[in-house]
Amino acid sequence: MLVPLYEAVYTRLDVGPATRLLGLGCGSGLALLMAVSRGAAVTGVDTSAERLDLARERLLPDGRDARPGTADTRIVRGSPADAARADAPAYTVVTAFEPIGCRAGDAEGLGELLADAVPLAGRGAAVVLAGWGPPERCATASVLRVAAKLAEPLRGAGAWRPTDRDDLERVAARAGLRPDGSGRVACPFGYADVDSAVRGLESTGLFDPAVAATDQVQVHKELAEALHPHQRRDGTVWMPNVFRYLVARVP
């Protein structure tokens, strides 16, 4: 879904064989795979065992946590601090591609990740933060409100919030980073049908609080209804979105 964002950032930063990249919240590893295809050495960090299993299938098909004899590729479950190695060079690029600006507390959560990650990066390293664009330019915003409504019994856990244009800059400032440019990228979400769209959106983790507050069946039903306005005559689902990214530097 966010492939255009990954490509825009990697092109801007000239990610390649000289790059040592740390991917925060790497999920199923697609962004890491794209960096590896450019020759970068990558380390992916996430807390979801299920998503990291998918990342390992993509990047480490032999089942190891690192790929010996090639560009360093590591998958780590835990926090960025768990990826630290005394014998490893500093990272030159740190990415946080999971966009903020849709859930209460997501900016604070990103700040905590950066507190652990920035010390692992070298001076002048690029730190990339991503966020949702304005709600009026993100068709998926209306669907995310469904998650907020269903998660309401948990009061604050995963509650939807509108994005703020200065979200990324504030997070960077709190982390002691120096802004060095930004951009916007169109990332439409397209699915073959409603069921595929529901599965795809649920796999992002954005609806986990809703599932915890209700159940999987209820979330599936509500999501399908919210997606109906975005369904085309041929049955496909199409939701135009715009995402923003900020490039900041480690001083």
Model-derived features: positions:
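Conserved Class I S-adenosyl-L-methionine
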Residues: 28, 169-251
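A short acidic, Gly/Pro-enriched loop at the edge of an enzyme's catalytic core
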Residues: 81-94
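Class I SAM-dependent methyltransferase SAM/SAH-binding core
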Residues: 20-22, 28-83
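Conserved catalytic/acceptor-binding region of the Class I
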Residues: 111-112, 118, 122-190
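Residues lining the SAM
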Residues: 96-100, 130
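Conserved alpha-helix/loop element of class I SAM-dependent methyltransferases that forms part
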Residues: 1-19
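A short, conserved alpha-helix within the catalytic core of class I
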Residues: 102-116
